[in-house]
């Protein structure tokens, strides 16, 4: 009897930690309004940080190259969490502005690529690639192509018809 409470407290701690890793967007959104320390305690150290032009500080949590997610925690000027979201979505990608955005803009939005950067000499374009899911959890690759001046030329989403990691697990 006397051991039940510590056991249940231990189980509750494990379940809460699992929720943060299994449902990071929902967990992060519950922290909105909280300080940076709470976000760091929940998700750990960010993989990258950026000071955005509007004064927002963005923490990137990348699961690349093996995962399919990049999360952004945006903090206001007072250091309070203002938003937490998954960045590798079609909605976020379609906001990219070819001819306007630069490598810096893509990095601030999606983090630096964790897959090898490719250079296509015939196109004279550098490509950054990210793994993502499209509708119905279909594995895909998002690529951003830059000209030699570092300006975004185009973006592309290519669906992985083989099923991503599932086809390689056999």
Please state what every model-predicted region is:
Residues 88-91, 159-161:
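A short acidic/small-residue loop/turn micro-motif
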Residues 20-22:
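Bacterial signal peptide processing site
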Residues 15-18:
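C-terminal motif of bacterial Sec signal peptides marking the signal peptidase cleavage site
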Residues 24, 28-80, 98-170:
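A cross-family detector of function-defining hotspots
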Residues 1-9:
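Bacterial N-terminal signal peptides that target proteins for export
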Residues 11-13:
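Short, contiguous, helix-prone interaction/anchoring segments in small proteins
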